[in-house]
Regions:
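Intrinsically disordered, low-complexity and often Lys/Arg-enriched segments
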Residues: 1-3, 72
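Short acidic-hydrophobic surface loop/beta-edge motif
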Residues: 3-7, 26
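C-terminal structural segments of small proteins and small subunits
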Residues: 47-74
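Charge-dense, helix-prone N-terminal extensions
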Residues: 9-13
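A short, structured beta-strand/loop element
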Residues: 14-47
Length: 74
């Protein structure tokens, strides 16, 4: 499970051989949220508003890299 980014209080991970659609896991000590890479839709879970804003901005800014990494790991 590669950690793609670390922030204060949470990280963004991608798991090997994970289910579709392509997504990342936004994980903190007491929360987890799955976010679709292509459109930024929240697939499941919830996180604090500050975490959500930071994660969504990072996912949007790194969408091409994330899709390439998804193809590499699946």
């Amino acid at each position: 499970m590669p950690t793609l980014a670390r922030f204060a209080g949470f990280e963004i991970d991608m798991y090997f051989e994970d289910h579709n659609p392509p997504h990342v896991h936004v994980v903190g000590r007491e929360f987890e949220m799955l976010v679709a890479i292509r459109d930024g839709a929240v697939l499941t879970g919830a996180v604090p508003p500050r975490v959500r804003r930071t994660a969504m901005r990072w996912i949007e800014d790194n969408r091409a890299m994330l899709l390439a990494k998804w193809d590499e790991l699946q």
